[in-house]
Amino acid sequence: MMEGLKKRTRKAFGIRKKEKDTDSTGSPDRDGIKKSNGAPNGFYAEIDWERYNSPELDEEGYSIRPEEPGSTKGKHFYSSSESEEEEESHKKFNIKIKPLQSKDILKNAATVDELKASIGNIALSPSPVRKSPRRSPGAIKWNLSSEEVARPRRSTPTPELISKKPPDDTTALAPLFGPPLESAFDEQKTEVLLDQPEIWGSGQPINPSMESPKLTRPFPTGTPPPLPPKNVPATPPRTGSPLTIGPGNDQSATEVKIEKLPSINDLDSIFGPVLSPKSVAVNAEEKWVHFSDTSPEHVTPELTPREKVVSPPATPDNPADSPAPGPLGPPGPTGPPGPPGPPRNVPSPLNLEEVQKKVAEQTFIKDDYLETISSPKDFGLGQRATPPPPPPPTYRTVVSSPGPGSGPGTGTTSGASSPARPATPLLPCSSTTPPPPPPRPPSRPKLPPGKPGVGDVSRPFSPPIHSSSPPPIAPLARAESTSSISSTNSLSAATTPTVENEQPSLVWFDRGKFYLTFEGSSRGPSPLTMGAQDTLPVAAAFTETVNAYFKGADPSKCIVKITGEMVLSFPAGITRHFANNPSPAALTFRVINFSRLEHVLPNPQLLCCDNTQNDANTKEFWVNMPNLMTHLKKVSEQKPQATYYNVDMLKYQVSAQGIQSTPLNLAVNWRCEPSSTDLRIDYKYNTDAMTTAVALNNVQFLVPIDGGVTKLQAVLPPAVRNAEQQRILWKIPDISQKSENGGVGSLLARFQLSEGPSKPSPLVVQFTSEGSTLSGCDIELVGAGYRFSLIKKRFAAGKYLADN
């Protein structure tokens, strides 16, 4: 391109005049270069319009030569070998520009800025160009072909030639974001009837009113249930609908098979004994709460003979507390952390039993329980008559601070202290940096009066304290005395009680924080310091048990039964609150994914429901508050040291889909020979069985081996063999999607026998899981007056067997 350039004489960049009528615009800021209108650089005086003529333009806006239209095609914009003087003598143009008409002048007033903008439309020379900051670069058309760049343009303003980028069409991006969020509960199924036969196995009822299996018993049996809260317009008027509840005769198809397995009777030391028909019938007597002398919480200090039989010897600190679900009643699995209580079959996640005198039973408090799941709405003002006192320290703070509550003098606003405590200085809630609590002396478990117990600004789970947002209350803080909670201005005086064991026994989760409570104190139940208009904390727990029987490797022969229960937990101080507020708001809740349940047995003395609801996916229940208050009062009298009261609300059976509903698929293969036995166990983690994929914890595989085992030739992975009990045990900490091969594995073993061949025995598997359920059910409150401080979900293996 540069080879054709001649030595510059009076033209800039060697541009020929026949290719460009006007002077070069490549370097407009250089001195000595003329403007296209003949004026020197920087001169913007009156323009001589007679020098211009309106040329004829083609369809692209280019000027057409008068003598040789289109003669520029095929030409080049660089100089040829001929001199410019010779070419100029051959090619001379006389150009006249017509003056603009008046109407055109009105439309396009030739201002200096518009002239500068119009110059930008002229095609640039390929020569290196330095742009001037006074020249607008935005009007240059960049998407021109090489031919278009070579063709010259006139400097006449032509606004229609300016390239304009069309705006982006935002509607075209809509498919990138996908369809709108669909409802999580689209699947509509037929509403499950409540009047189903009882699914917990047949047995002799202890209630005389339940002797007839077809007896129709309306509930509640006590005071007529109150109407739902008036401040819930969406809730229709309810009527106490009768519910047919009675023990049924339905039995599982594997009852005969499972109970005919004599080789499992010697597994008591690990998983507890197999429930015989007699024990199942005895356990079936454990029905709903009823206001008799025996508390449903089972506070007897000693185990009855029945409890001694059912209690698993290997897990005394993890009792179960739900009735046996028929012939597949689960032995007590390794339950969640909680103090021991009377054993049932499914451990309750919020066990309220008293703490025994073992330190090992209280080692469950770990950092993995410190999860903040509070909702921002919990920190709102709500319907508070008076701002509540500051919260107690959190889990990490309590361990090294004087106690799980604020000091005796800690308060929010001016008000009289509790009658049982002297008045002490108050700590304004607007203070952002209160003094930290003093360290806890090892020989002084109580906080001296007058010293604040809150103020650790680095607490990990405490919300910011502002004057416009009252701090949350301490629902389960131990008080220094058993003062009444009727005063709305009473100050929190929670301190650490004198206990024999320094290890905390219970953890209460409320408003995004964990509070430690203590058993064994002589100060009575923990008061619930709050006003009459404050919301009461309630905890809910779903506990489900999966019972499965696998036959060989055939999925069609898998039998599954899933049972569950929903428990509500109330703080002990709620009894005093009810005593001072005899007409509390009705507790109403809604169970979500109700259509996945086959049989539902509400507590007939405490729960009412509306069977006329249209939505089969949800079910609304409300509590008979007079019966609940009577029940909690009786429990508090029988268990004055209890911190929480668990009340069974629902028992249900989950709709199972065969092997697809089992969280862990199993297949066992035996090869028995006179001198040796080969055993292979295949397992597979099944995420489809859970609503949320969670790990299976503490997985144990137990197999009895007979035939006189003399040697273990190969065991993969390593296992523990008990020669006396003739069994082999594999322990896997957890199985999940993150495990090797996505939770798919095998267990292999070969045994040398002296009294062979061996007889194949059923495989027994145990596991627990936290954070999800197999039914996918959830719960939410309806109306005001209460709040959920914790919703816990878990499931465990009951009778989880696999045979050859």
Swiss-Prot record:
Gene3D superfamilies: Mu homology domain, subdomain B. The modification Phosphothreonine is found at T156, T158, T223, T235, T300, T304, T386. Residues 535-803 form the MHD domain. The modification Phosphoserine is found at residues 54, 80-81, 83, 125, 127, 132, 145, 212, 241, 263, 276, 292, 295, 348, 375, 462. Residues 1-90, 124-181, 199-254, 289-500 are annotated as: Disordered. GO terms for cellular component: AP-2 adaptor complex; clathrin-coated vesicle; cytoplasm; plasma membrane; presynapse. Keywords: Coated pit, Endocytosis, Membrane, Phosphoprotein. It comes from the Eukaryota. One of its GO terms (biological process) is positive regulation of feeding behavior. PANTHER family: F-BAR DOMAIN ONLY PROTEIN 2, PROLINE-SERINE-THREONINE PHOSPHATASE INTERACTING PROTEIN 1. This is SH3-containing GRB2-like protein 3-interacting protein 1. The lineage of its organism: Eukaryota, Metazoa, Chordata, Craniata, Vertebrata.
